[in-house]
Curated annotation (Swiss-Prot):
Localization annotation: Cell inner membrane
Function: Peptidoglycan polymerase that catalyzes glycan chain elongation from lipid-linked precursors.
SUPFAM superfamilies the record matches: Lysozyme-like (SSF53955)
Top-level EC class: transferase
Keywords: Cell inner membrane, Cell membrane, Cell shape, Cell wall biogenesis/degradation, Glycosyltransferase, Membrane, Peptidoglycan synthesis, Transferase, Transmembrane, Transmembrane helix
One family name in Pfam for this protein: Transgly
Name this protein carries in UniProt: Biosynthetic peptidoglycan transglycosylase
UniProt pathway: Cell wall biogenesis; peptidoglycan biosynthesis
């Protein structure tokens, strides 16, 4: 009886592993039709009695301003080009910060955020964290860094029901993602930790200070030169 149960569990895990590899491999080339986070936001709005229309327009990476690419890397994951999905130093710093009390600090890389937004529900359970790690490893193994950045910029939330760079550029600045200035991009990147509470187009003093810091980091990263070398170190 026990052996039969174990065999079924192993078989289910193997099917899940194979299926998830296939899905991630397909999404290496095919734009995701939607994300788990979009579904979650839509369902939440139904339960709240105020259904929302999701705003999202997929844009190829070369149609998105380099300013925005650098801004989100500067603000969210400065070791993006170097790591394989996990920033160990940031994780250790977040653990120490959280142990001291106060606000909870995250340490998710862009790759982890893509995994969470695409495939998973909100929460901090061990199961969800384990699945996030699994999908992050698959994405890092099967996608290029440019593809990870492209999917991130097209799936991240920038206001209530506003997903992706093009929708965000239109919503906040009445422009296209390709035309975002360094200042506009820095404000969009500055609100990413809490995009439903902070506004890129009507920034608080904190968001303005954070945007200024992000612009400094953008210059230090090297701008276009950084992007040109993004994939040169590794990938097949």
């Amino acid at each position: 009886m026990l052996q039969s149960i174990l065999r079924r569990i192993v078989k289910a895990l193997l099917w899940f592993a194979a299926g998830s590899v296939l899905v991630v491999l397909v999404l290496r080339w095919v734009p995701p039709p939607g994300t788990a986070l979009m579904v979650e936001r839509k369902v939440e709005s139904w339960f709240d009695g105020e259904p929302i229309d999701l705003q999202r327009d997929w844009e190829p990476l070369d149609k998105i301003s380099d300013n925005l690419k650098i801004a989100v890397i500067a603000g969210e994951d400065q070791k993006f080009a170097e790591h394989w999905g996990f920033d160990v130093d940031a994780i250790q710093a977040a653990i120490l910060h959280n142990e001291r009390g106060g606000s909870i600090r995250g340490a998710s890389t862009l790759s982890q955020q893509v995994s969470k937004n695409l495939f998973l529900w909100s929460g901090r359970s061990y199961l969800r964290k384990g699945l996030e790690a699994w999908f992050t490893m698959l994405i890092e193994l099967l996608w290029s860094k440019e593809r990870i950045l492209e999917v991130y910029l097209n799936s991240v939330e920038w206001d209530e029901g506003v997903f992706g760079a093009q929708a965000a550029a239109q919503h906040h600045f009445r422009t296209n993602a390709s035309a975002l200035s360094a200042q506009q991009a820095s404000y969009l990147a500055a609100v990413l930790p809490n995009p439903r509470q902070w506004s890129a187009s009507h920034p608080s003093s904190y968001v303005s200070r954070r945007a200024g810091w992000i612009r400094q980091q953008m210059r230090q990263l090297g701008g276009d030169e950084y992007l040109q070398g993004l994939n040169s170190s590794r990938r097949w």
